[in-house]
Amino acid sequence: EGDGLLMAMEAGAQLGNMSHAYWMQSALEFKPQHRDAKPNYMLGSDERARPGAILVNRKGQRFVNEAANYNAIGKSLHAFDAGTHSYANLPYWLIIDQRYRDRYPTFNTPAGGPVPSYMIEGATLEELAEKAGIDPAGLAATVARFNEMVRGGHDDDFQRGDNSYDNFYMWGDTSYDPPFRTLGAIDQGPFFAVQMESGALGTAGGPKTNANAQVLDWNGDVIPGLYAAGNAMDAVLGEAYGGAGGTLGPGMTFGFIAGRHLGTHIPNR
């Protein structure tokens, strides 16, 4: 809940990287029958990368390689449109068809399961778009182009399926050969949409440190006796992300560095 950050600020720590996080795609499930219940945040890491799924913005347009890593996709969500003073890709939607639902689970719904409350259904793409608040013509054109590229075996727009990450990481369907582990047509109605949001696995900001994991003040001087490591420090990779577990290495490394330095610099009493 940010206790470490608050304590560091009270000690006069210099902060860095505060506008960045380890981004993740998420969807919300509301259960109105539970009056005091908070919404259920569902991570959307693999649904988007399977064959027969795309992500679109309110114009019905794709804006990213859906099989890319979740942090990179998260960055694409924060593109600001100065003309409309809005985020061009927020909100956004996962678009799938009945074939997808029959074959794959979707968030907390098993394959072939009933349509959940958070999923919008339409007999046609145009009907789906109207219900979801997406531009109908834009969505229809996007799906038509995507299906054409699938038939050609290549995503000319975002190169989805071109690299090893797209095809051999955990998100795709390994029962197919590349690039069809992640590329599949959306052409068997009814069609479905899930509104998505920008989520995060953790923050990348915190107090700045030196090579000894000592926290620095706003003049760049060491704050005596104060150390930081892991997610409690300004991330060593800045706004970059090394992948799953990418925060554990810095946590262990700088925890060790802090302990070693502290052990050899204990003031005489």
Predicted regions and their residues:
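A conserved FAD-binding loop/helix module that cradles the flavin
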Residues: 1-7, 233-266
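A glycine-rich dinucleotide-binding beta-alpha-beta segment and adjacent secondary-structure elements
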Residues: 138-236, 240
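Phosphate/diphosphate-binding loops
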Residues: 34-77
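Gly/Pro-rich active-site capping loops and adjacent beta-alpha segments
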Residues: 61-92, 217, 222-238
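Glycine-rich loop(s) and the adjacent beta-strand/alpha-helix scaffold that form part
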Residues: 1-31, 81, 248, 257
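N-terminal leader/propeptide and maturation segments of large enzyme subunits in energy/redox metabolism
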Residues: 91-98, 104-156
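Short beta-alpha connecting loops at secondary-structure transitions
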Residues: 35-41, 109-114, 239-247
